[in-house]
Amino acid sequence: MSVGTGGEYWKDKGLPSVFKHELLKRYLPQFGGMTGSHSQDGRVVYLDGYAGEGRYENGDAASAEIALRVSSHFRAKRGLTLECFFTEPQQKSFEKLNRVVEHYRAGGVPAHAHRGEVDGVLDGVIQKAVGAPLFLFLDPCGLVLPQDRLVGVLAQQRPQKKPATELLMNFSMMAVWRLGGHVRSPKGNEKSLQRFDDVCGGTWWREYFAEAAAPGARDGAAEDAIEAVAAEYARRLARRTGMFVQSVPVSHAPHKRAVYRLVFATRSPYGLWVFGDSVARARDAWWQTLELQEEQNDPDALFSTVSILRPDPEVVAKEAVPAMAANLEQLLRAGRAVKLVDHTLELFGAYYGQVTEPAARNAVKYLHGEGKTSTTGVGGAKTRALIVHPARP
């Protein structure tokens, strides 16, 4: 069960929410467009399982209104239907959410708000999504649904590639830290530990913190255990569902540990490609917002934190191109043509989620300039659809 959010949360967006909502705003329209154009009646289903109030007090759109705006745009401009379902257990938050939803419903947007926990409506939404693509957005302030429940949805109820099913969820690093303390303490709360066992799909996570609490454990072992648990959670979800799973850290400030990770799951190589591009663009918005906040808080400062700590995007992109070209060269050594979108992670390597799509085309051009591919990278299909051939003998 999510613990909910207090009133301070809804005044305006914190930096983690800036990243999360920018990512959702960029990716959801592309998911809807990619899958809806091939679905029955052009219909896509979206579930926001922890919708909160839907809108911040300063008027900024939260996750619910972001989805409603996408749905409104699809209806007006693209002839697609994004049917939205929202759940929120807290009465006051639900009342505000419902007002936002009703405003869009009055304009013809197919949207439904339910007061209660997401687990109580999940199966009903899945039934509504039969024959249609489904996107699940689960963003609790606390613990997410048990992994067995998620696996049941992704691997049993929705195991097929088409219509597509995708998941974007918040895996709380703060909750892992708090519950890891129960493992390390002789007075730990066993009920809380069992609840997190359910979230993780087993007791395996406890071992990481038991090792961190052992005599002679090095400094920082507990902090590293949090990261290890998050990484293993994503690996297990991928193995149990057969999906591509990526885990993106989200923090309050540069060089700080993540407060949560956004875990993304898809069966589509196109989804994996577009998500990486969306992450890179959301990361840029995060830095821009931080810089704006610093300017507002201290307009007379000579230097901002951003100017000192932010990696120059142009430098990162410039460094990425030869590294990605080398990755592509390695793929071509098999002697067969390579369709870029089918090798997203191999192509981008460490730069996945760090650089945007144009870096991939530039890598093709770079490799062509070295005489290692006959494909020029100029013109033609969308970058993701480029087919790159080995150099002619």
Say what each PLM segment does:
Residues M1-L340, F348-P393:
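Class I S-adenosyl-L-methionine-dependent methyltransferase catalytic core
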